[in-house]
Amino acid sequence: FAWNNLALAELRDLNRHRTGNRFTPLIQAGFYLPPEIDRAPHAALLADQLELTRALLERSSPAYVYSLLLGAQTPFEHSTHADKFIYEAELRTGLGAHFRYAGHLSAALHAFFAQVPEARDWVVEGTAEPE
């Protein structure tokens, strides 16, 4: 499964303790701010960060990754076996799951169900209700 807009903060957590292969090019493809946060007060910071990142990339500097903020979104790919994916999807959509993880894993789980419809009977998708 893959996402084209996973924030670095989420990637950092999802990348831990998981089986399979994970890949991200660490190229910024957007920036996540919660809907209730007004982007306007942060526009100058985000513009400066974008300018710095572009300048470092134009120089082919590997240091560009240090210009990425935790809200920077990047493509993320994760290949794994079905049993490990099901475990992760149930865990990340279950009780107390972070709403962003739950949204990402719910979408991936629905794509999985489209390919393996018989799995619906034995895979439990949670509702990410708070503990």
Language-model features: locations:
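Family-specific signature for flavin-dependent thymidylate synthase
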Residues: A2-E131
